Amino acid sequence: MFIDNIYDQNIYTNIDFLDTNKQKNKKSNNFINHFQKALGEISNIQNNSKKNIEKFQSNHSDISLNDIMINLQKSSISIELAIQVRNRIISAYKEIMNQQI
């Protein structure tokens, strides 16, 4: 039985291959982290809008109707943006899945 010499194996190529996979995972995790961060910001905007509405309804003098309307528009636009991003991601996924190999 013949056993290959260990010196004939290119270990550095294998290490580079593993490092490339780590970089790909970091890139995909980076996208996921950005997306989760954006969703968290959208949630914060909506929560701030709700809190400001409750303050306005309880007659706090530091909140005006203009601030309420601006916050509502911000939350509406952020939700629309999130929906558009989701739709684009889904359409890109469907396009990739429909490609023939």
UniProtKB/Swiss-Prot annotation:
It is found in: Bacterial flagellum basal body. It comes from the Bacteria. Keywords: Bacterial flagellum. It holds the Pfam family FliE. GO terms for biological process: bacterial-type flagellum-dependent cell motility. One of its GO terms (cellular component) is bacterial-type flagellum basal body. SUPFAM superfamilies: Phase 1 flagellin. One of its GO terms (molecular function) is cytoskeletal motor activity. PANTHER family: FLAGELLAR HOOK-BASAL BODY COMPLEX PROTEIN FLIE, PTHR34653. NCBIfam families: fliE (TIGR00205). Belongs to the FliE family. HAMAP family: FliE (MF_00724). This is Flagellar hook-basal body complex protein FliE. It comes from Buchnera aphidicola subsp. Schizaphis graminum (strain Sg).
